[in-house]
Regions:
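Short beta-strand scaffold segments in enzyme catalytic cores
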Residues: 50-57, 118-122
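Short, flexible loop/turn motifs enriched in small residues
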Residues: 44-50
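Acidic/polar N-terminal loop/beta-strand segments that form early-domain functional surfaces
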Residues: 57, 67, 94
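Structured interaction and signal-relay segments at domain junctions
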Residues: 62-74
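Short, charged/polar surface micro-motifs in flexible loops or helix N-caps
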Residues: 59-60, 97
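Active-site-proximal loop/helix of nucleotide/amide-processing enzymes and allied scaffolds
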Residues: 1-27, 75-195
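Short acidic/polar alpha-helix capping motifs at helix-coil junctions
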Residues: 16, 41-44
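Short, basic/aromatic recognition patches
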Residues: 32-42
Length: 195
């Protein structure tokens, strides 16, 4: 159970808590659990640094990373996927400041790594201990210039995040991406025949 990032100056008991994140699971179709969110945020408070986890669609933690106060390195994760579709991996990370709105680097990572979704969680500043979060995802649509569009929701209370049907969202997005990919392939074939 490897922890990615700068961990050499982290106390051993905190490293053990980070390693324990690998043992937690999330129900299929649910973004996260209170237990996972709370543990990630407690470690974030102890370190003053971002913590990120990658989960697959079955809710298994695949990777844990530690960053600094503003960012966490999100390495590529090898996964099998059809061309143009999402990776089957979602990223949940903490924002030590409590401002869980997704940043430009968050959206850039979502687009580059083609996560199912990108979530940021934190403790709400005005209500001690209340967890809030934001979620970013592909819409399955393209702008006029061909750029794949992203959307986000939040900040939302943790209980609202748990009601998002992730399976439905991902299935809908992948269907749109597949339809667009099929149309693009048909357009290319048509152009090839006309040439």
């Amino acid at each position: 159970m490897q922890i990615n990032g700068e961990i050499q100056n982290i106390k051993q008991y905190i490293v053990k808590r980070l390693e324990a994140l690998y043992e937690l699971t999330v129900p299929i179709g649910q973004l996260s659990t209170h237990e996972l969110n709370a543990e990630m945020l407690e470690v974030t408070e102890l370190l003053g640094r971002e913590v990120a986890v990658y989960l697959n669609r079955r809710g298994k933690v695949l990777q844990v990373s530690v960053g600094d106060t503003d960012t966490v390195d999100l390495p590529e994760f090898k996964s099998r996927r059809a061309e143009g579709k999402l990776t089957g991996i979602r990223c949940i990370h903490t924002h030590p400041s409590g401002d869980t709105r997704l940043s430009e680097p968050d959206f850039s990572s979502l687009r580059r790594l083609r996560f199912d979704c990108m979530a940021a969680i934190g403790f709400r500043a005005d209500k001690a201990g209340e967890i809030v979060g934001s979620l970013g995802f592909f819409t399955g649509d393209c702008a006029e210039d061909g750029t794949e569009q992203l959307s986000s929701v939040g900040p939302l209370p943790e209980r609202a995040l748990h009601t998002i049907n992730l399976t439905y969202l991902i299935t809908t997005i992948n269907k749109k991406l597949s339809a667009r990919s099929t149309k693009s392939t048909e357009d290319e074939e048509e152009r090839a025949l006309l040439a």
